[in-house]
Swiss-Prot record:
Residues 64-72, 141-163, 212-240, 301-316 are cytoplasmic. Receptor for MSH (alpha, beta and gamma) and ACTH. The activity of this receptor is mediated by G proteins which activate adenylate cyclase. Mediates melanogenesis, the production of eumelanin (black/brown) and phaeomelanin (red/yellow), via regulation of cAMP signaling in melanocytes. It comes from Leontocebus fuscicollis. Its main location: membrane. A lipid is attached at C314 (S-palmitoyl cysteine). One of its GO terms (biological process) is adenylate cyclase-activating G protein-coupled receptor signaling pathway. This is Melanocyte-stimulating hormone receptor. The gene is MC1R. GO terms for cellular component: plasma membrane. Residues 1-37, 94-118, 184-191, 267-279 are extracellular. InterPro entries: GPCR_Rhodpsn, GPCR_Rhodpsn_7TM, Melcrt_ACTH_rcpt, MSH_rcpt. PROSITE patterns: G_PROTEIN_RECEP_F1_1 (PS00237), G_PROTEIN_RECEP_F1_2 (PS50262). One of its GO terms (molecular function) is melanocyte-stimulating hormone receptor activity. The chain crosses the membrane at residues 38-63, 73-93, 119-140, 164-183, 192-211, 241-266, 280-300. It is a multi-pass membrane protein.
Length: 316
């Protein structure tokens, strides 16, 4: 069931694109003009989802095992891993169900299939919203730890973090239920796009401000020790490179998906837009790739978490 316009499920029929025989090809739109269509084999999609699933399960298990990691920061990281786990798991589940239905291996009533479809859609949408929210929450947590270092533990207490986490999950589930129910309204898609842009701006502003403070601190140390300025410039370049990678990965992995939703609203029948719609599964694959990259950026850089992860793996 490929995407043909605005009157499709937000996360259900949209990602139920058929598998082509080649990985890259030219497909014709309804006017006969060639469209560049990149096909993601179901095997590759499921494999990436499995890697993400295993990786994020390990993060959750490591944080749950080590009491030293039961701080507000690691609670947000754990919830990010859990939401990423649900993103990959729900997409894998829907792909598997579609393949079984197409193969005739799963025979059930249409009403049951539709109910399952809606449930998976809500799970996928809510986990995506949670993933974006927890990326923003981690940025806020790090910002407070830098700019309010002396008051950090009194501001970011564990009960406050737990209340914030509960609020994020409840709001995401309720919002996704409304989004899936009213998926054919343009306002729903625009709300999702605005939410993504808000998270992008929030992360960019906070991380840029943190980088500026870090460069200022490094400059003060250099002046104190009377070192040469190239060291400060090198630190600034490394910090800028790290920031570019962090925000760049976020934008490249999530941006195409929300661009797709924007085009569904503003040009559902345009020839160029219809060509872009054919690559929806590519955009979902990029999100799955982001769920694989997130633990590398936010979790595995912690020496304590890596040590606990080794203990978890050895215990198995």
């Amino acid at each position: 069931m490929p995407m043909q316009g605005a009157h499709r499920k937000l996360l259900g029929s949209l990602n139920s694109t058929p598998t082509a025989t080649s990985n890259l090809g030219l497909a014709a739109n309804h006017t006969g003009a060639p469209c560049l269509e990149v096909s993601i084999p179901d095997g590759l999609f499921l494999s990436l989802g499995l890697v993400s699933l295993v990786e994020n399960v390990l993060v959750v298990a490591a944080i749950a095992k080590n009491r030293n990691l039961h701080s507000s920061m690691y609670c947000f990281i754990c919830c990010l891993a859990l939401s990423d786990l649900l993103v990959s798991g729900s997409n894998m589940l829907e792909t598997a169900v579609i393949l079984l239905l197409e193969a005739g291996a799963l025979a059930t009533r249409t009403s049951v299939v539709q109910q399952l479809h809606n449930t998976i859609d809500v799970l996928t949408c809510s986990s995506m919203l949670c993933s974006l929210c927890f990326l923003g929450a981690i940025a806020v947590d790090r910002y407070i730890s830098i700019f309010y270092a002396l008051r950090y533990h009194s501001i970011m207490t564990l009960p406050r973090a737990q209340r914030a986490i509960a609020a994020i999950w409840v709001a995401s589930v309720l919002s996704s239920t409304l989004f899936i129910t009213y998926y054919d309204h343009a306002a729903v898609l625009l709300c999702l796009v605005v939410f993504f842009l808000a998270m992008l701006v929030l992360m960019a502003v906070l991380y840029v401000h943190m980088l500026a403070r870090a460069c200022q601190h490094a400059h003060g140390i250099i002046r104190l020790h009377k070192r040469q300025s190239p060291a400060h410039q090198g630190f600034g370049l490394r910090g800028a490179a790290t920031l570019t990678i962090l925000l760049g990965i976020f934008f490249l992995c999530w941006g195409p998906f929300f661009l797709h939703l924007t085009l569904v609203v503003f040009c559902p029948q345009h020839l160029t837009c219809s060509c872009i719609f054919k690559n929806f599964k590519v955009f979902l694959t990029l999100i799955i790739c982001n769920t694989i990259i997130d633990p590398l950026i936010y979790a595995f850089r912690s020496q304590e978490l890596r040590r606990t992860l080794k203990e978890v793996l050895c215990s198995w």
